[in-house]
């Protein structure tokens, strides 16, 4: 299976940085993407809920700016890790934010829900 263009055209190394609970934040994700690897973070790191909106806006803005200034070396995409377990009361809101900001990659863990895949 061939890599999709979003990965083929931007990855310098075939790496997804681990979405580290509490540690991963916009600064780390932006640096990872600029370095050519998929930067990632757990949605639950953005607390309280409205902070996720701010994080995604900032990540998109910074990576868009980088890509405009460096057309020959575009940033790799980022990924948002979603906990799909029934105990995650934020899942619906967090997925709305991923859709709003067109998160390039969504990683799921601790369960599966068809509507998350369709988003």
Task: Describe the predicted segments one by one.
Residues 1-119:
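Active-site entrance/lid segments in N-terminal catalytic domains of soluble metabolic enzymes
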């Amino acid at each position: 299976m061939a890599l999709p263009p979003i990965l083929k055209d931007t990855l310098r190394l075939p790496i997804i940085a681990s979405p580290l609970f509490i540690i991963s934040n916009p600064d780390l994700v932006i640096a990872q993407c600029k370095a050519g690897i998929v930067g990632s973070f757990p949605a639950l790191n953005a607390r309280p809920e409205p902070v996720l909106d701010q994080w995604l806006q900032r990540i998109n803005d910074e990576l868009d700016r980088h890509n405009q200034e460096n057309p020959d070396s575009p940033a790799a995409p980022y990924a948002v890790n979603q906990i799909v377990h029934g105990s995650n009361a934020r899942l619906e809101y967090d997925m709305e934010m991923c859709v709003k900001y067109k998160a390039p990659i969504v990683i799921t863990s601790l369960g599966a829900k068809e509507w998350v895949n369709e988003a």
